[in-house]
Amino acid sequence: MSGRGKGGKGLGKGGAKRHRKILRDNIQGITKPAIRRLARRGGVKRISGLIYEETRGVLKVFLENVIRDAVTYTEHAKRKTVTAMDVVYALKRQGRTLYGFGG
């Protein structure tokens, strides 16, 4: 027994035995003032109270779609790290071309 715990394979390359923090209600991290600032940038003067939850929902769906596509590109390339280019290609696939991040 080398006293390295369950995943002890020596240096590096220690399987997928890390503890993952359970993610709950992270969408609430998109705060009311943050949504208000985005709306102001878009030229909105007055905002209904119901907008905030609706915006969080729409943003969540949008990000899920982009991230799913970006991860698909990453997996296809047999990588474990999602690159900026994966996200650029994912956005392009959805018809939202983004300039300024290479490619």
Swiss-Prot record:
Pfam families: CENP-T_C. Residues 17-21 bind DNA. The lineage of its organism: Eukaryota, Metazoa, Cnidaria, Anthozoa, Hexacorallia. It comes from Acropora formosa (Staghorn coral). One of its GO terms (cellular component) is nucleus. Core component of nucleosome. Nucleosomes wrap and compact DNA into chromatin, limiting DNA accessibility to the cellular machineries which require DNA as a template. Histones thereby play a central role in transcription regulation, DNA repair, DNA replication and chromosomal stability. DNA accessibility is regulated via a complex set of post-translational modifications of histones, also called histone code, and nucleosome remodeling. Belongs to the histone H4 family. Residues 1-14 have a biased composition (Gly residues). The modification N6-acetyllysine is found at K17. The nucleosome is a histone octamer containing two molecules each of H2A, H2B, H3 and H4 assembled in one H3-H4 heterotetramer and two H2A-H2B heterodimers. The octamer wraps approximately 147 bp of DNA. It is found in: Nucleus; Chromosome. The modification N-acetylserine is found at S2. Keywords: Acetylation, Chromosome, DNA-binding, Methylation, Nucleosome core, Nucleus. Its main location: nucleus. The keyword DNA-binding applies. Residues 1-20 are annotated as: Disordered. The modification N6-acetyl-N6-methyllysine is found at K6, K13. InterPro entries: CENP-T/H4_C (IPR035425), Histone-fold (IPR009072), Histone_H4 (IPR001951), Histone_H4_CS (IPR019809), TAF_TATA-bd_Histone-like_dom (IPR004823). This is Histone H4.
